[in-house]
Amino acid sequence: RGAHVSFVDAIILIAFIAYAVSVGLWNRQQASKNLEEYFLAGRSLPGWKAGLSMAATQFAADTPLLVTGIIATAGIFGLWQFWIFGITFLLLGFVLAGAWRRAGVVTDAELTEVRYGGTPAAVLRGVKAFYFGTVINGISLAWVLFAAAKIAEPFLLWDQWLPGPLFQSVVNMVDAVGVPLTVGGIGDPEVWVKTASNFLSLLMILGVVAFYSATGGLRGVVATDIVQIAIMALGTFAFAVTVVWEVGGLGSMTERIYETFTFGGPGGILPGEILAFTPGH
């Protein structure tokens, strides 16, 4: 079942985990000095590091799946919507960030209290805490973690690596919960084996992230983000070059799209619409 993790992939994975853990430990003492050091890196973070960290955060596990899905259902034109993030971040950086820094606050909730004060501020903080902390973050984490599980499923085969009785105990647990966490869904004959394997993969991912975030604070997060964006950018470029090479070049790629979607793709989209940079054509 699934694919095998190559030696190079294993080295990259192990090296990054070791780096992330070491970054958390390295920045632990500095981050533990006070809240500003922990949450804001002492307000000394260079702009380029902050920018790369934001880019890495936007480029999550779900990003390739999302972009591919948008192109398949709405065409290249559908990607224009992502310009809103560029405009928003420029607005934040050049218009609002200065005022936030002068306010001397540490968190968004504190800014709300300083800006409004009194009972209205308390109500607003409560609403924002529930909406952003529970609804928005819950939805965001759900799709990112599910995307991570879909990507990890063919490669992280815990059922082949762990002792049988130990892994079976995890299978029994997820079976009792009854919530499938697999690409195939409930109809897959190995649904609970794959769900158990994906559950262990997510535990490992969350454990590493929680460790370096909790110990290193913002400095630890940014340091790992910079390495992540470098790996993702290089990997994406290498994958794109490989795909174009395999189909015979950019011209052949266009021909393959017309051949594959001659009678329409998802939702009836036509080849010309998939390749369109403007609505319709």
What are these regions (language model features)?
Residues 35, 76, 217-218, 226:
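Membrane-helix interface/capping residues of multi-pass secondary transporters
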Residues 12, 16-23, 60, 89, ...:
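Alpha-helical transmembrane segments of multipass membrane proteins
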Residues 54-63, 71, 84-92, 131-140, ...:
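Membrane-embedded alpha-helical segments of transport systems
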Residues 25-33, 97-106, 158, 218, ...:
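Transmembrane helix-loop junctions in multipass membrane proteins, especially transporters and channels
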Residues 1-64, 213-216:
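Membrane-interface "cap" regions at the ends of multi-pass membrane proteins
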Residues 2-5, 40-49, 66-81, 113, ...:
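Loop-to-helix junctions at membrane interfaces in multi-pass transport proteins
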Residues 20, 79-214, 275-281:
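Helix-loop-helix module between adjacent transmembrane segments
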